[in-house]
Structure formats: C-alpha cells, structure tokens
Amino acid sequence: MGSSFGHLFRISTFGESHGGGVGVIVDGCPPRLAIDIEAVQAELDRRKPGQSKITTPRKEDDRVEALSGLLDGVSLGTPIAMVVRNKDQRPGDYKEMQVAFRPSHADATYQSKYGIQARSGGGRASARETIGRVAAGAIAKQMLRQLHGTEVLAWVKRIHTLEANIDPAVPTLDAVESNIVRCPDAAMAEQMIERIESIGRDGDSCGGVIECVVRRPPTGLGMPVFDKLEADLAKAVMSLPATKGFEIGSGFAGTTLLGSQHNDAFLPTSDGSLHTATNNSGGIQGGISNGEPIVLRVAFKPTATIRKEQQTINASGEATTLAAKGRHDPCVLPRAVPMVEAMVALVLADHALRQRGQCG
C-alpha cells in the first residue's frame, strides 16, 4: 500500500536503503518507443550520493539493471522492471538511532503506524527510495519528448536565505549542471555552496526551494474536478522526502495582486492555439494545461538527520539525546532536482495517456 503511483502510466517502487537494492516497475509505457537505458543512468547519476563536497559521502555506483520490458532499446509495451543494487551500507552508523527517534524524521511515525521499522538507513523513508522514481521518470521523459516534444527541467532557486532570481524561460540543462548545487545563476551558486559547506561544518542542515518548468506541454492535460493537473502535480512532488510546500504559477505571491493584474490575457495566434500575454496561471487553468510553460516550485525542509545533539525520546518514551552519526546530506536540494523532474514527468506521461484515451 502506498508504493504505487499513476493510472495508465503506473509505477511501483520497492526496496530499502540498507536492503539488497531498490527499484521500480513501470507499467503502461506505450510500445515501440526508443528507450535509452544510458539516459536513465544519466538521470540516476544526477541524484546519486557522493557526487560532490556538499552531498552525503556515501559511495554508490547506482548502476541500473533493466530486467524486462525492453528489446534492443525499444519498449515492448509490457512492464519495465529496473533495479539498482545497494553496495555501501553501514548499519553500524545507525546504532544510536535504533534506540532513539530522530527529531522530525519518519522513525517515530513509522514505529507508531507499523509497530516495526527498518531503522538502519531509514528504510522506505530514505531518499534511496527515490532511485526507482528517477529511473521511471527518465522513461517518462523519453516518452514525452518523443510523442510531444516536451521538456521537463528543474533547478535550485533558493538555499536557506539565498535566493536566485531566474526567468524560467532561460535555463538549460547545461547551465543547471554547470555547478554542484544545480543553480543556473553562477554567482548565486557560489554563495549557496559556501552556505551549505558552512552549515554542514557546524553539524547542521538547511533547506530551500526547487523550481521546475515544463516546456511545450501538451494542451488539455488534466481532468475536472478531482484530477486537476496541478492537484496531481502537487501530490506527486509532495510525496518526495523532506517536501513541505508547493506552489504553481504566481503561487502565494499572486494573492497580493488584483484580478486585473493577475489575469492572463489571451492573444490571437495563426494556428488557433491558446497563447497568453502573461503566465501567472503557470500553464494550467481550470485544472487543465493551456499549452503555456508549466512553472512550479517545491519547498524542502532542512535534512532531519544532523550531527548536533538534539532532545528526543527512545522507543519506550523516555527522554534522551541524539547526535546522529552516519553519512547524510547537509542539504537535499542539489540531489533533489532530478527527483522533482521525475515526479513531474510521471504525472504528465500519465495524463497524456489518459487524454489520448478519453479525447483521442
């Protein structure tokens, strides 16, 4: 329960951080699509640990194995199973956390719900669970690009109190990947890196905001009233670890505008397609995509597992303290960029198939 996502383009992830491996089954991918497994690997490389001085030092190759659903790089229309083996587990780092709950982590709520949990490495609450999502999202990206010419791109917009002012129409993948924090503003990226390093040296952590744009999305995605596109996007990205907020288009800032300022005026086009003068709606109106770029932002909290001593309780409810050991990200944002892209791509792929099924 709770490990599957989607309707027609449906995924199920499996595995724990310190188990034998993690992976995903993708069901519903159309047949006869060219699927580049190295493109899947490239996405996993963007999210893997140990990639820079501001991420966890855990060393994992995160090499993906495609077990089914592909033949000579072409989708068969049958379930695509992919797995990544875990290799660098250190259960000993979690001895203290097996008797004391990490504040603001899933340890306590998992124990309360199930009466048992895989505390070593965080189990299903670990960010390693997102390997399956990123692998599946890479398949969804390839489908969207081939069938609709759609691009999904995200970047770090804010780290702690440092925020970059970025026009969503400008960033490229090369610009995002040009630095280890994945912020396309090079000057701001340097400040962000220094901030993460400083906070990490103090044994603490920080959060921030990731912005994502969908360029050339199909028109008509989304269904009234409970399957609105932005509602499904919100559910998708808010299911990622450490997420605490979501906004689309003008978001909360739009509440300060008047209707005459916020409304996106329609403009005539030669082909009769929808086009607006502004994009405060973020590419979605009435829960349905209008063809303009979809722009959304996701807030991530500071990493819960930190080296600073904190007050907590043990499994018996007794007061204790915890200074966590192990290898943990001082900031999840740089590695979360491909995770956000993956979840957005999965929603769009699913809705594209649903739109084709209902409306042709």
UniProtKB/Swiss-Prot annotation:
Listed GO MF terms: chorismate synthase activity; FMN binding
SUPFAM superfamilies assigned to the protein according to its UniProt record, in alphabetical order: Chorismate synthase, AroC (SSF103263)
Gene3D superfamilies listed in its UniProt record: Chorismate synthase AroC (3.60.150.10)
GO biological process: amino acid biosynthetic process; aromatic amino acid family biosynthetic process; chorismate biosynthetic process
Any single GO CC term annotated in Swiss-Prot or TrEMBL for this entry: cytosol
Listed cofactors: FMNH2
Annotated FMN binding sites: 124-126, 286, 301-305, 327
Protein name per Swiss-Prot or TrEMBL: Chorismate synthase
Lineage, broadest ranks: Bacteria, Bacillati, Cyanobacteriota, Cyanophyceae, Synechococcales
Gene: aroC
